[in-house]
Curated annotation (Swiss-Prot):
Keywords: Cell membrane, Lipoprotein, Membrane, Methylation, Pheromone, Prenylation
Protein name, per record: A2-specific pheromone
Propeptide residues per the UniProt entry: 36-38
Lipidation sites (S-farnesyl cysteine): 35
Subcellular location(s) per record: Cell membrane
Function summary: Mating pheromone for A2 allele.
Modified sites of kind Cysteine methyl ester: 35
Length: 38
């Protein structure tokens, strides 16, 4: 449970930043992949 919450909490802000940068390249289906990497 803690690991899931930590992952979501850490991925939330990163996903926003990655989405803004990925928006220039390819933002189709990529956010999920970036979220996993984060």
């Amino acid at each position: 449970m803690l690991s899931i919450f930590e992952t979501v909490a850490a991925a939330a802000p990163v996903t926003v930043a990655e989405t803004q940068q990925a928006s220039n390249n390819e933002n189709r289906g990529q956010p999920g992949y970036y979220c996993l990497i984060a």
